[in-house]
Amino acid sequence: MRPQDSTGVAELQEPGLPLTDDAPPGATEEPAAAEAAGAPDRGRCWLCLSSPCCSRTEPEAKKKAPCPGLGLFYTLLSAFLFSVGSLFVKKVQDVHAVEISAFRCVFQMLVVIPCLIYRKTGFIGPKGQRIFLILRGVLGSTAMMLIYYAYQTMSLADATVITFSSPVFTSIFAWICLKEKYSPWDALFTVFTITGVILIVRPPFLFGSDTSGMEESYSGHLKGTFAAIGSAVFAASTLVILRKMGKSVDYFLSIWYYVVLGLVESVIILSVLGEWSLPYCGLDRLFLIFIGLFGLGGQIFITKALQIEKAGPVAIMKTMDVVFAFIFQIIFFNNVPTWWTVGGALCVVASNVGAAIRKWYQSSK
Protein backbone atom coordinates (compact mmCIF):
# COMPACT_ATOMS: atom_id res chain seq x y z
CA MET A 1 0.00 0.00 0.00
CA ARG A 2 0.97 3.35 0.01
CA PRO A 3 2.70 3.18 2.70
CA GLN A 4 3.92 4.31 1.55
CA ASP A 5 2.78 1.11 3.26
CA SER A 6 4.60 4.17 3.44
CA THR A 7 6.88 2.37 1.74
CA GLY A 8 8.93 2.47 2.62
CA VAL A 9 6.44 3.67 -0.27
CA ALA A 10 6.75 3.70 0.29
CA GLU A 11 6.73 0.91 1.80
CA LEU A 12 7.40 -3.55 0.14
CA GLN A 13 6.25 1.91 -0.29
CA GLU A 14 5.16 1.94 2.39
CA PRO A 15 2.30 4.15 2.02
CA GLY A 16 3.32 7.46 0.91
CA LEU A 17 7.05 7.47 0.13
CA PRO A 18 7.64 10.36 -2.23
CA LEU A 19 9.39 10.64 -5.51
CA THR A 20 11.79 13.49 -5.49
CA ASP A 21 14.71 12.05 -7.38
CA ASP A 22 14.10 8.36 -7.70
CA ALA A 23 11.02 7.25 -5.81
CA PRO A 24 7.31 8.00 -6.26
CA PRO A 25 5.46 10.36 -3.90
CA GLY A 26 2.65 9.57 -1.58
CA ALA A 27 2.42 6.00 -1.24
CA THR A 28 3.14 5.10 2.00
CA GLU A 29 3.28 2.41 1.38
CA GLU A 30 6.35 1.88 -0.29
CA PRO A 31 9.80 3.52 0.20
CA ALA A 32 12.02 0.76 -1.11
CA ALA A 33 10.66 1.10 -4.62
CA ALA A 34 13.13 3.83 -5.47
CA GLU A 35 15.97 1.56 -4.52
CA ALA A 36 14.79 -1.28 -6.70
CA ALA A 37 15.86 0.26 -9.95
CA GLY A 38 19.41 0.65 -8.74
CA ALA A 39 20.18 -2.51 -6.78
CA PRO A 40 22.67 -5.06 -8.15
CA ASP A 41 21.42 -7.88 -10.36
CA ARG A 42 21.48 -11.22 -8.60
CA GLY A 43 19.44 -13.42 -10.91
CA ARG A 44 15.90 -14.21 -11.78
CA CYS A 45 13.02 -13.75 -9.36
CA TRP A 46 9.38 -14.80 -9.60
CA LEU A 47 8.34 -11.81 -7.48
CA CYS A 48 9.04 -9.29 -10.24
CA LEU A 49 6.92 -11.04 -12.88
CA SER A 50 9.80 -10.95 -15.34
CA SER A 51 13.43 -11.83 -15.80
CA PRO A 52 15.91 -10.62 -14.80
CA CYS A 53 14.96 -9.59 -11.28
CA CYS A 54 13.70 -6.14 -10.32
CA SER A 55 17.06 -5.36 -8.74
CA ARG A 56 19.02 -4.23 -11.77
CA THR A 57 21.80 -1.86 -12.61
CA GLU A 58 20.82 1.72 -13.38
CA PRO A 59 21.59 1.70 -17.13
CA GLU A 60 19.54 -1.47 -17.61
CA ALA A 61 16.70 -0.24 -15.44
CA LYS A 62 15.98 2.70 -17.70
CA LYS A 63 15.82 0.77 -20.96
CA LYS A 64 12.86 1.44 -23.22
CA ALA A 65 9.55 -0.18 -22.40
CA PRO A 66 8.33 -2.98 -24.71
CA CYS A 67 5.55 -0.59 -25.81
CA PRO A 68 5.09 3.16 -25.30
CA GLY A 69 3.33 4.08 -22.10
CA LEU A 70 3.75 0.68 -20.44
CA GLY A 71 5.63 2.21 -17.50
CA LEU A 72 2.84 4.74 -16.97
CA PHE A 73 0.26 1.95 -17.14
CA TYR A 74 2.19 0.05 -14.46
CA THR A 75 2.21 3.22 -12.33
CA LEU A 76 -1.54 3.66 -12.77
CA LEU A 77 -2.14 0.02 -11.85
CA SER A 78 0.13 0.41 -8.82
CA ALA A 79 -1.79 3.50 -7.68
CA PHE A 80 -5.06 1.60 -8.03
CA LEU A 81 -3.80 -1.40 -6.03
CA PHE A 82 -2.39 0.78 -3.25
CA SER A 83 -5.66 2.72 -3.10
CA VAL A 84 -7.70 -0.48 -2.86
CA GLY A 85 -5.41 -1.62 -0.04
CA SER A 86 -6.06 1.68 1.74
CA LEU A 87 -9.79 1.12 1.27
CA PHE A 88 -9.56 -2.25 3.02
CA VAL A 89 -7.62 -0.66 5.90
CA LYS A 90 -10.47 1.82 6.25
CA LYS A 91 -13.01 -1.00 6.21
CA VAL A 92 -11.30 -3.00 9.00
CA GLN A 93 -12.48 -0.82 11.87
CA ASP A 94 -12.47 -3.51 14.58
CA VAL A 95 -8.72 -4.17 14.33
CA HIS A 96 -6.20 -1.61 15.57
CA ALA A 97 -4.07 0.05 12.90
CA VAL A 98 -0.88 -1.27 14.51
CA GLU A 99 -2.23 -4.82 14.43
CA ILE A 100 -3.03 -4.42 10.73
CA SER A 101 0.59 -3.36 10.27
CA ALA A 102 1.73 -6.50 12.10
CA PHE A 103 -0.34 -8.73 9.81
CA ARG A 104 1.09 -7.03 6.75
CA CYS A 105 4.64 -7.46 8.07
CA VAL A 106 4.05 -11.19 8.55
CA PHE A 107 2.63 -11.49 5.04
CA GLN A 108 5.57 -9.68 3.49
CA MET A 109 8.04 -11.67 5.58
CA LEU A 110 6.73 -14.89 4.06
CA VAL A 111 7.46 -13.44 0.62
CA VAL A 112 10.86 -11.89 1.38
CA ILE A 113 12.48 -14.88 3.15
CA PRO A 114 12.54 -17.19 0.09
CA CYS A 115 13.78 -14.28 -2.05
CA LEU A 116 16.71 -13.66 0.30
CA ILE A 117 17.54 -17.37 0.41
CA TYR A 118 17.42 -17.60 -3.37
CA ARG A 119 19.61 -14.53 -3.85
CA LYS A 120 22.07 -15.64 -1.12
CA THR A 121 22.43 -12.13 0.29
CA GLY A 122 22.15 -13.10 3.96
CA PHE A 123 19.86 -11.59 6.56
CA ILE A 124 22.18 -9.07 8.27
CA GLY A 125 23.69 -6.89 5.58
CA PRO A 126 27.01 -5.07 5.13
CA LYS A 127 28.66 -4.13 8.41
CA GLY A 128 28.86 -0.42 7.68
CA GLN A 129 25.22 -0.19 6.61
CA ARG A 130 23.47 -2.02 9.45
CA ILE A 131 22.71 1.09 11.48
CA PHE A 132 21.07 2.64 8.41
CA LEU A 133 19.12 -0.56 7.78
CA ILE A 134 17.84 -0.49 11.36
CA LEU A 135 16.81 3.16 11.03
CA ARG A 136 15.16 2.42 7.71
CA GLY A 137 13.21 -0.45 9.27
CA VAL A 138 12.03 1.47 12.33
CA LEU A 139 11.14 4.70 10.52
CA GLY A 140 9.51 2.95 7.56
CA SER A 141 7.33 0.72 9.72
CA THR A 142 6.35 3.68 11.91
CA ALA A 143 5.25 5.54 8.79
CA MET A 144 3.05 2.58 7.85
CA MET A 145 1.41 2.39 11.28
CA LEU A 146 0.68 6.11 11.31
CA ILE A 147 -0.89 6.19 7.86
CA TYR A 148 -3.05 3.17 8.71
CA TYR A 149 -4.20 5.01 11.84
CA ALA A 150 -4.94 8.09 9.71
CA TYR A 151 -7.02 6.01 7.30
CA GLN A 152 -9.10 4.73 10.21
CA THR A 153 -9.64 8.08 11.93
CA MET A 154 -10.24 10.50 9.04
CA SER A 155 -11.57 10.42 5.50
CA LEU A 156 -9.66 8.39 2.94
CA ALA A 157 -9.17 11.37 0.62
CA ASP A 158 -7.88 13.69 3.36
CA ALA A 159 -5.38 11.14 4.67
CA THR A 160 -4.12 10.32 1.17
CA VAL A 161 -3.64 13.97 0.22
CA ILE A 162 -1.75 14.81 3.42
CA THR A 163 0.68 11.94 2.90
CA PHE A 164 1.57 13.50 -0.44
CA SER A 165 3.27 16.27 1.53
CA SER A 166 6.19 13.87 2.00
CA PRO A 167 8.33 15.32 -0.85
CA VAL A 168 8.46 18.63 1.02
CA PHE A 169 10.03 16.97 4.05
CA THR A 170 12.33 14.92 1.81
CA SER A 171 13.74 18.08 0.23
CA ILE A 172 14.32 19.65 3.64
CA PHE A 173 15.91 16.54 5.18
CA ALA A 174 18.09 15.98 2.11
CA TRP A 175 19.23 19.61 2.34
CA ILE A 176 20.12 19.19 6.03
CA CYS A 177 21.54 15.65 6.04
CA LEU A 178 22.85 15.10 2.51
CA LYS A 179 23.78 18.70 1.69
CA GLU A 180 21.55 18.65 -1.37
CA LYS A 181 20.52 21.98 -2.86
CA TYR A 182 17.31 23.56 -1.56
CA SER A 183 16.23 25.99 -4.27
CA PRO A 184 13.60 28.75 -4.32
CA TRP A 185 11.45 26.34 -6.33
CA ASP A 186 11.56 23.89 -3.42
CA ALA A 187 10.48 26.68 -1.08
CA LEU A 188 7.57 27.53 -3.40
CA PHE A 189 6.43 23.90 -3.53
CA THR A 190 6.66 23.80 0.27
CA VAL A 191 4.34 26.80 0.54
CA PHE A 192 1.85 25.17 -1.85
CA THR A 193 1.88 21.95 0.16
CA ILE A 194 1.45 23.68 3.52
CA THR A 195 -1.45 25.69 2.07
CA GLY A 196 -3.09 22.49 0.87
CA VAL A 197 -2.74 20.78 4.24
CA ILE A 198 -4.21 23.84 6.01
CA LEU A 199 -7.24 23.77 3.69
CA ILE A 200 -7.80 20.11 4.55
CA VAL A 201 -7.25 20.45 8.30
CA ARG A 202 -9.25 23.70 8.57
CA PRO A 203 -7.95 24.84 11.97
CA PRO A 204 -10.68 26.61 14.01
CA PHE A 205 -8.60 29.76 14.55
CA LEU A 206 -8.70 30.31 10.77
CA PHE A 207 -11.98 28.68 9.70
CA GLY A 208 -14.11 28.91 12.83
CA SER A 209 -16.00 25.92 14.23
CA ASP A 210 -17.45 24.71 10.92
CA THR A 211 -16.79 20.96 10.52
CA SER A 212 -19.13 20.33 7.59
CA GLY A 213 -18.00 17.53 5.32
CA MET A 214 -15.99 15.73 8.00
CA GLU A 215 -17.04 12.13 8.54
CA GLU A 216 -15.74 12.22 12.12
CA SER A 217 -15.50 14.67 15.02
CA TYR A 218 -12.95 17.44 14.66
CA SER A 219 -10.81 15.87 17.41
CA GLY A 220 -10.71 12.62 15.43
CA HIS A 221 -9.96 14.56 12.27
CA LEU A 222 -7.10 16.32 14.05
CA LYS A 223 -5.65 13.03 15.36
CA GLY A 224 -5.74 11.59 11.87
CA THR A 225 -4.10 14.73 10.51
CA PHE A 226 -1.18 14.50 12.93
CA ALA A 227 -0.82 10.79 12.13
CA ALA A 228 -0.79 11.47 8.36
CA ILE A 229 1.75 14.29 8.73
CA GLY A 230 3.87 12.06 10.98
CA SER A 231 3.70 9.32 8.36
CA ALA A 232 4.87 11.78 5.69
CA VAL A 233 7.78 12.89 7.90
CA PHE A 234 8.92 9.33 8.68
CA ALA A 235 8.51 8.29 5.03
CA ALA A 236 10.68 11.23 3.97
CA SER A 237 13.29 10.25 6.56
CA THR A 238 13.28 6.71 5.19
CA LEU A 239 13.88 7.93 1.65
CA VAL A 240 16.83 10.05 2.78
CA ILE A 241 18.31 6.98 4.49
CA LEU A 242 17.82 4.93 1.32
CA ARG A 243 19.65 7.62 -0.63
CA LYS A 244 22.43 7.56 1.95
CA MET A 245 22.84 3.79 1.55
CA GLY A 246 22.72 4.06 -2.23
CA LYS A 247 23.13 0.81 -4.16
CA SER A 248 25.31 -0.94 -1.60
CA VAL A 249 22.37 -2.75 0.04
CA ASP A 250 20.21 -5.34 -1.70
CA TYR A 251 16.60 -4.33 -2.28
CA PHE A 252 15.10 -7.34 -0.50
CA LEU A 253 17.44 -6.97 2.47
CA SER A 254 16.09 -3.45 2.98
CA ILE A 255 12.56 -4.84 2.96
CA TRP A 256 13.63 -7.61 5.36
CA TYR A 257 14.73 -5.11 7.99
CA TYR A 258 11.51 -3.20 7.46
CA VAL A 259 9.20 -6.17 8.05
CA VAL A 260 11.17 -7.69 10.95
CA LEU A 261 11.57 -4.45 12.89
CA GLY A 262 8.03 -3.45 11.96
CA LEU A 263 6.69 -6.69 13.44
CA VAL A 264 8.74 -6.25 16.63
CA GLU A 265 7.62 -2.63 16.95
CA SER A 266 3.98 -3.61 16.39
CA VAL A 267 4.09 -6.33 19.05
CA ILE A 268 5.62 -3.93 21.60
CA ILE A 269 3.08 -1.17 20.90
CA LEU A 270 0.11 -3.53 20.97
CA SER A 271 1.31 -5.06 24.25
CA VAL A 272 1.67 -1.63 25.84
CA LEU A 273 -1.74 -0.46 24.58
CA GLY A 274 -3.44 -3.78 25.34
CA GLU A 275 -5.05 -3.72 21.89
CA TRP A 276 -4.43 -7.30 20.82
CA SER A 277 -7.59 -8.77 19.30
CA LEU A 278 -8.35 -11.74 17.08
CA PRO A 279 -10.03 -10.54 13.87
CA TYR A 280 -13.59 -11.72 13.46
CA CYS A 281 -14.22 -14.59 11.09
CA GLY A 282 -15.40 -13.50 7.70
CA LEU A 283 -14.76 -10.14 6.10
CA ASP A 284 -12.18 -8.77 8.56
CA ARG A 285 -9.79 -11.68 8.01
CA LEU A 286 -10.40 -11.53 4.27
CA PHE A 287 -9.66 -7.79 4.26
CA LEU A 288 -6.37 -8.37 6.10
CA ILE A 289 -5.30 -10.84 3.42
CA PHE A 290 -6.28 -8.38 0.70
CA ILE A 291 -4.27 -5.61 2.38
CA GLY A 292 -1.15 -7.75 2.09
CA LEU A 293 -1.92 -8.90 -1.46
CA PHE A 294 -2.75 -5.47 -2.87
CA GLY A 295 0.20 -3.88 -1.09
CA LEU A 296 2.52 -6.47 -2.61
CA GLY A 297 0.97 -6.07 -6.05
CA GLY A 298 1.24 -2.30 -5.89
CA GLN A 299 4.90 -2.54 -4.94
CA ILE A 300 5.70 -4.92 -7.79
CA PHE A 301 4.14 -2.66 -10.41
CA ILE A 302 5.67 0.58 -9.12
CA THR A 303 9.05 -1.16 -9.13
CA LYS A 304 8.55 -2.30 -12.72
CA ALA A 305 7.39 1.18 -13.71
CA LEU A 306 10.61 2.69 -12.37
CA GLN A 307 12.62 0.13 -14.34
CA ILE A 308 11.28 1.18 -17.75
CA GLU A 309 10.11 4.77 -17.29
CA LYS A 310 11.74 7.99 -16.12
CA ALA A 311 11.05 9.12 -12.57
CA GLY A 312 9.30 12.36 -13.58
CA PRO A 313 6.40 10.82 -15.53
CA VAL A 314 6.02 8.12 -12.87
CA ALA A 315 5.74 10.78 -10.15
CA ILE A 316 3.08 12.65 -12.09
CA MET A 317 1.04 9.52 -12.78
CA LYS A 318 1.39 8.49 -9.12
CA THR A 319 -0.87 11.42 -8.17
CA MET A 320 -3.72 9.20 -9.40
CA ASP A 321 -3.62 7.85 -5.83
CA VAL A 322 -5.50 11.00 -4.85
CA VAL A 323 -8.09 10.56 -7.62
CA PHE A 324 -8.77 6.95 -6.62
CA ALA A 325 -9.06 7.99 -2.95
CA PHE A 326 -11.72 10.57 -3.84
CA ILE A 327 -13.62 8.06 -5.99
CA PHE A 328 -13.56 5.33 -3.31
CA GLN A 329 -14.61 7.79 -0.60
CA ILE A 330 -17.67 8.80 -2.62
CA ILE A 331 -18.65 5.28 -3.73
CA PHE A 332 -17.98 3.21 -0.61
CA PHE A 333 -18.52 5.76 2.18
CA ASN A 334 -21.06 8.08 0.55
CA ASN A 335 -18.91 11.02 1.62
CA VAL A 336 -18.54 13.76 -0.99
CA PRO A 337 -15.35 15.78 -0.32
CA THR A 338 -15.84 19.47 0.44
CA TRP A 339 -14.47 22.23 -1.75
CA TRP A 340 -11.90 22.87 0.98
CA THR A 341 -10.60 19.33 0.55
CA VAL A 342 -10.64 19.63 -3.24
CA GLY A 343 -8.74 22.92 -3.05
CA GLY A 344 -6.21 21.44 -0.63
CA ALA A 345 -5.75 18.40 -2.85
CA LEU A 346 -5.13 20.60 -5.88
CA CYS A 347 -2.47 22.56 -3.99
CA VAL A 348 -0.65 19.42 -2.82
CA VAL A 349 -0.91 17.67 -6.19
CA ALA A 350 0.26 20.81 -7.99
CA SER A 351 3.28 20.92 -5.69
CA ASN A 352 4.13 17.27 -6.41
CA VAL A 353 3.63 17.63 -10.16
CA GLY A 354 5.70 20.82 -10.22
CA ALA A 355 8.55 19.16 -8.33
CA ALA A 356 8.41 16.12 -10.62
CA ILE A 357 8.46 18.23 -13.80
CA ARG A 358 11.39 20.26 -12.47
CA LYS A 359 13.38 17.09 -11.67
CA TRP A 360 12.45 15.63 -15.04
CA TYR A 361 13.63 18.77 -16.83
CA GLN A 362 16.90 18.86 -14.89
CA SER A 363 17.66 15.20 -15.59
CA SER A 364 17.00 15.64 -19.32
CA LYS A 365 19.58 18.42 -19.71
Curated annotation (Swiss-Prot):
Main subcellular location of this protein, as a coarse class: membrane
Disulfide bonds: none
One BP annotation, GO: calcium ion export across plasma membrane
Domain EamA positions: 80-202, 233-357
GO cellular component, one term: plasma membrane
Subunit and interaction comment: Interacts with STIM1; stimulated by depletion of intracellular calcium. Interacts with ORAI1. Interacts with the plasma membrane calcium-transporting ATPases ATP2B1 and ATP2B4. Interacts with ATP1A1, ATP2A2, KPNB1 and XPO1.
Name of the protein described by the UniProt record: Solute carrier family 35 member G1
Organism of origin: Homo sapiens
GN (gene name): SLC35G1
